[in-house]
Structure formats: structure tokens, C-alpha cells
């Protein structure tokens, strides 16, 4: 990978022999964020094992400490959170530094929207380019007020409303972050908060809120629309949580094992929530041999071990409605498509343009640089596969400080002639 901005030394990934053995992946990021937030709002002590200790989740931990919760990690890596109760958050004394975490920022805005306090959110250069309007708009309807930088970006100062106004809101775009922000605001809001979700997104917030004791119900209509209702002024109970492996992190070894000839890899303890299973479903449709063994349920979340065997893949044109179930995994799915037989067409991916980087443009540019024939679309990409032949490689890749871009091209390097 070539150096970009303040990245350290570039790295090169070269063709690999057959991959074999077993691995585990870090804890699920979505569940890790929510474990800290909901534990901080519970009355009493919660315990979390397997928390993802990346910078994004640690930013959430620091924010909860700044607002009065006791959050600590013991010598065995178990996290202990003593909550302050719903409505008990304290005014932070300094700005809340979110680093590069859009999830922390948007969910915490929701959490604070129904508390009588003022908070300023700051972030790194990448996060400060990402728009926040899709969250601030519904939270403003609940009574919160926002003073943001131009383009509804960070730095941003918000003042919560107490009492907040319960909201009846239809999501204009599929977004688990917007849905979760509204639900978190609803926890300390009198009355019923209601969300209409035309296209299902990841449902960790709903599962975990119910697990912590919130009065939450989900009704699914005939066309798949989900109606979510939450009774406010909840009292959350402390929990013992075991965080499953992150399916988004598992995506990279899964695709690598499918593409590198002769490979067979077992990935243990992967979260298999149906709202996150889009990539596994897609790869199976392309011909990928992916078997789930030892299926089980841990803390209300389905978990299993994945056995992945190298496979010849064929091109695919997935229905755009499936995008929310694998929105973070599209970059590595593009790499799989680059090695498949035939054409793949991915549409309905406008959301990728406002991630840590413009992931459509960055992936298209990078794939061209290593010899892949691609056509960039406004809402997606068309990829002509190599039919299993190694990619040319050799071209420099600008990752735009985006970890999913870097990891995706690391996988591409394993099946290239000249490295990436």
C-alpha cells in the first residue's frame, strides 16, 4: 500500500500459498459500542467479555466515563461498567473526542438528546468531513438543538431536551445508526417512541435494549416493513455480556480463504445475526463453500464457526435492497467479484460515498490500478471478473486512511502476480 497523508510506511501484500488452520476475529464493533452505552445507563454493575478494544470503541468508553459512568478493564481483559441509570448522565467537562468513530458520534448524540446537558463533539480530519444531518434532523424534532460546522459536520455542539418529545418517525434511508440514535433518545423520553423501518437494518440495538429490560416491541408487516416501539423513561438492568466475533472483520479472512487456491480455514465464534449476513449469503450465491458449524446463541445473538474452502466464484448482481445487510463488507466483496467468472453489478450503494472515504471511488481507482476492469457508477460499480486468474497487481493503492480499503486490497494482494 502506498503512503497517504500521515500513514506510516507503505506495506506490500504478495501472492500466498494455500491458507489453512483456525483463527478468531475481534469482538463485534456494533455490539461493543452498545454494550458500553447501555451498561452505562443501567442501574448497577455490568460485565462485558470480548469487547473490541479498537480506537472507535475506546472513544465510546471514554465518553461514558466523562459523563459519570465507571468504566474499567481488569487484568483478564474483562470490562466492568457501573451505570448511572437512564437520565443520570452528567455534563461532560470537556469536548467528547470521537476520533474516527461515526458510530460513537451518532449514537451518543441520540443518547444525549433527551438529557438536560450540553456536549461538544470533535473528531479527526476524516470524521469531520462526514455529514451528521440525517441524525440531527430527527433528534431536533425531539427537542434537541445543534450548532454544527458548515455542512452539518463536526465540531458540533448539542443541547439535549428534558423532557424530550416522543417521536413517530419513518426512516427515509436505511440506517441502523439513525434508528439507534432515535431509540437511545427515546429511553429518557416520556411516552412512546415509534420508528417505521421500510428496509431492515442491523438490529443489535433492538435485541440489546430488550435484553437490558427496555419495553420494546417489533412488528413486521407483510411487505417486510418493521414497526419498532419503545416505551420511554425505562429502567435498565445490568447484564453479563459476551461479545461475539465481528462478521465485518471475519469478511477479510473469509474472502481470502475463498480466493487463495487450496485454502481451508475455520473462523471461530462469528456473530451470525441475519441483519449482518449479507456477505456470507452473497458469497454462497457466487459459489463460495462456506459452512456454519456449531451454531449456538450467546446473549441473544446467533453465533457459529465458519469453515471456508477455496472455491471458483461466478459474477453476481445482488438486489440493491440487500445493501444494508453488508454495507461495510462491499469493498472486500468487490475484490471477490474481481476474481469471479463474469460480470458483477453492484447498485444502491450511495451510502458508501460518505463512509471513512468515498468507498466506491476509492475501490474503483484501486482495482483499476491492479489490472481490474471496472466501471464506476453514481450508486455502485460494475466489475469484470478474471475468472479466477491472478490479478496483475503492482499498482500503488491510496487507502484514504480507510481501514476497510486497506484490508480489502491486502486480500487482493494474496491473489496477485506482482503484489499490492
Where is each model-derived feature located?
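Structural preference for solvent-exposed beta-strand-turn elements
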Residues: 1-420
Amino acid at each position: 500500500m502506498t503512503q497517504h497523508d500521515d500513514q506510516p510506511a507503505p506495506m506490500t501484500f504478495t501472492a500466498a500459498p494455500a491458507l489453512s488452520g483456525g483463527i478468531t476475529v475481534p469482538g463485534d464493533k456494533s455490539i461493543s459500542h452498545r454494550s458500553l452505552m447501555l451498561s452505562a445507563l443501567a442501574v448497577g454493575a455490568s460485565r462485558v467479555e470480548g469487547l473490541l478494544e479498537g480506537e472507535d470503541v475506546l472513544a465510546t468508553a471514554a465518553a461514558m466515563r466523562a459523563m459519570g459512568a465507571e468504566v474499567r478493564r481488569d487484568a483478564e481483559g474483562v470490562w466492568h461498567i457501573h451505570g448511572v441509570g437512564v437520565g443520570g448522565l452528567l455534563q461532560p467537562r470537556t469536548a467528547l473526542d470521537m476520533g474516527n468513530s461515526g458510530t460513537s458520534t451518532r449514537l451518543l448524540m441520540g443518547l444525549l438528546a433527551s438529557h438536560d446537558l450540553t456536549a461538544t463533539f470533535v473528531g479527526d480530519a476524516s470524521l469531520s468531513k462526514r455529514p451528521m444531518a440525517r441524525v440531527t434532523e430527527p433528534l431536533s424534532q425531539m427537542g434537541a438543538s445543534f450548532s454544527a460546522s458548515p455542512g452539518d459536520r463536526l465540531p458540533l455542539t448539542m443541547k439535549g431536551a428534558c423532557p424530550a418529545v416522543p417521536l413517530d418517525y419513518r426512516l427515509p434511508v436505511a440506517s441502523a445508526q439513525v434508528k439507534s440514535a432515535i431509540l437511545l433518545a427515546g429511553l429518557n423520553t416520556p411516552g412512546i417512541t415509534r420508528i417505521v423501518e421500510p428496509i431492515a437494518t442491523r438490529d443489535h440495538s433492538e435485541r440489546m435494549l430488550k435484553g437490558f429490560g427496555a419495553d420494546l416491541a417489533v412488528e413486521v408487516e407483510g411487505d417486510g416493513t418493521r414497526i419498532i416501539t419503545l416505551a420511554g423513561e425505562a429502567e435498565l438492568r445490568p447484564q453479563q455480556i459476551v461479545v461475539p466475533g465481528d462478521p465485518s472483520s471475519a469478511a477479510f479472512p473469509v474472502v481470502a480463504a475463498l480466493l487463495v487456491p487450496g485454502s481451508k480455514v475455520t473462523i471461530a465464534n462469528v456473530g451470525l445475526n441475519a441483519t449482518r449476513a449479507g456477505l456470507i449469503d452473497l458469497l454462497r450465491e457466487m459459489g463460495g463453500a462456506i459452512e456454519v458449524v456449531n451454531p449456538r446463541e450467546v446473549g441473544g445473538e446467533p453465533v457459529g464457526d465458519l469453515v471456508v474452502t477455496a472455491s471458483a466464484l461466478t459474477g453476481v448482481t445482488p438486489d440493491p435492497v440487500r445493501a444494508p445487510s453488508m454495507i461495510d463488507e462491499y469493498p472486500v466483496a468487490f475484490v471477490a467479484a474481481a476474481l469471479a467468472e463474469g460480470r458483477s453489478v453492484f447498485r444502491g450503494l450511495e451510502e458508501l460515498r460518505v463512509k471513512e472515504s468515498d468507498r466506491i471511488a476509492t475501490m474503483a481507482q484501486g482495482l483499476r490500478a491492479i489490472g481490474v476492469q471496472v466501471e464506476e457508477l453514481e450508486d455502485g460499480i460494475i466489475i469484470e471478473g478474471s475468472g479466477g486468474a491472478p490479478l496483475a497487481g503492482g499498482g500503488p493503492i491510496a487507502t484514504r486512511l480507510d481501514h476497510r480499503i486497506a484490508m480489502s486490497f491486502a486480500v487482493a494482494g494474496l491473489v496477485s502476480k506482482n503484489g499490492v
